[in-house]
Amino acid sequence: MKHTEKQLPLVYSCSGCSSSAQMANYLAVQLDRQGVAEMSCIAGVGGNVKKLVKTATSGRKIIVIDGCPLACSKHCLENHAVNADIYFDLSLMGVSKKLHEDFCHLQAKALLIQLKQVIDPSFKKSRLNSIPL
């Protein structure tokens, strides 16, 4: 079944140059690949691409993952009067913003579990071991 047929929530993420930004993007991609949410393009929303703005303003549940307090993804959506239903600022979840470094995959795996539990409270702990890196 396609993501759109299930009407999954939309997930938007930061994807800037820092380690925390890349972790935000990684987490959004994982939510998409695992069928928890459908990832859409925040750059397109910020760039006023009509099709992508239409998707963002469609009334679907919105999840936003920002890597730092600058909250770029959140602000891009707010410029189109779209507010996140669920918002994550990774800096408030213990993620350090580092330039010219990769993010910690073990930390990302742990955060993915936390995000999924917030997004879908019915997420069962018995499925935790099946989460790929």
Place the predicted regions along the sequence by residue.
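A general structural motif
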Residues: 42-46
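Iron-sulfur (Fe-S) cluster-binding modules
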Residues: 1-41, 51-61, 70-133
